[in-house]
Amino acid sequence: MSRLTLALDVMGGDIGPRITIPASIKALEKDPMLSLLLFGDSQQINPLLEQVPSALKERLRVCHCSRVVENNQGLSYALRHSKGTSMRLAIEAVQKGEAQGCVSAGNTAALMGLSKVLLQPLKGIDRPALISLLPTMDGGRTVMLDLGANIDCNANNLYQFALMGAIFAENQLDLVFPRIALLNIGIEEIKGYKSIREAADLLTGNSSLNYIGFIEGNLLLNGKADVIVSDGFVGNIALKTLEGAAKNVISLIKGKSRNHLLKPLFNWLIKLLFKDSYQRLQKINPDQYNGASLIGLTSIVVKSHGAANIEAFNNAIHDAALQARQQIPEKILAGLQK
């Protein structure tokens, strides 16, 4: 494990430092080779560090800034008024080489916009995409992109997403020749938008890619594909639907015993009978898993859920560290040049 520095926008998210600071400390405890730059309001940050052991404090630095990109700011406004904000300064730290990656739970559009401007897309990539790993019902994982960075995509955009997703899957999942599918409303060749059908033709024409055809929404988690590609509009809706369904089922299971006199026994039986299913549902519960990466840039940027809890934001930090150590941008660039 190599030494690594990450820049964190600790003011981002629905709660801010009360979540991001404990998560940062947890990340330092788990990763002895990790150092963190904490960008945010020192008056809010420092009290949360008072009980932190000095050995951990040596691996973090508070970078004070009083300005924040608000969640309700539109993209153009956020970009024009981003100077001196915790989000922009964290990304600039990566741009300057002071950190090897950035993590933020802040305004998604602003994070993507600033990252594109300051870090630049890789040569050969027109648009970066949001990518994440999802659990499958057979116990494995699948890569899915785009999850919201690009609402409208042409065939070449989708083709590039597939290339990046395949390289990401090879490294994150240790796969050879990962199976690629396009998310569509049917599996027949005539189905879907023109851009999807044209992307299918491009993928079919590349013998170095293992394109297996279209996949429908009801099969996203069945393990049929290792990489699932869509535009950001469809991908974001699909992801939020999966997350919402998982949370609702988990709440339903827990709620059955809410007023039961034998609640402890009932809870034990639920865990025993539905242990495997419950654990798999938890993996797509945004409270448990977290972190979508903005792939296709020259550096690592991970977007955490705005409503992330401590464990979830810690997972986003872990994802950023892993991708930086795996040199994902460099491997994508090398793959594009083959």
From Swiss-Prot:
InterPro entries named among the record's database cross-references: FA_synthesis (IPR003664), Phospholipid_synth_PlsX-like (IPR012281)
One Pfam family, short name: FA_synthesis
Top-level EC class as recorded in UniProt: transferase
GO MF annotation terms: phosphate:acyl-[acyl carrier protein] acyltransferase activity
Keywords: Cytoplasm, Lipid biosynthesis, Lipid metabolism, Phospholipid biosynthesis, Phospholipid metabolism, Transferase
GO biological-process terms attached to the record: fatty acid biosynthetic process; phospholipid biosynthetic process
Main location, first listed in the record: cytoplasm
Superkingdom of source: Bacteria
UniProt catalytic activity: a fatty acyl-[ACP] + phosphate = an acyl phosphate + holo-[ACP]
Pathway field: Lipid metabolism; phospholipid metabolism
EC code: 2.3.1.274
Cellular compartments annotated: Cytoplasm
Cellular component terms per the entry's GO annotation: cytoplasm
Family of this protein: Belongs to the PlsX family.
Function, in words: Catalyzes the reversible formation of acyl-phosphate (acyl-PO(4)) from acyl-[acyl-carrier-protein] (acyl-ACP). This enzyme utilizes acyl-ACP as fatty acyl donor, but not acyl-CoA.
Assembly behavior: Homodimer. Probably interacts with PlsY.
Protein name as annotated: Phosphate acyltransferase
Lineage, broadest ranks: Bacteria, Pseudomonadati, Pseudomonadota, Gammaproteobacteria, Pasteurellales
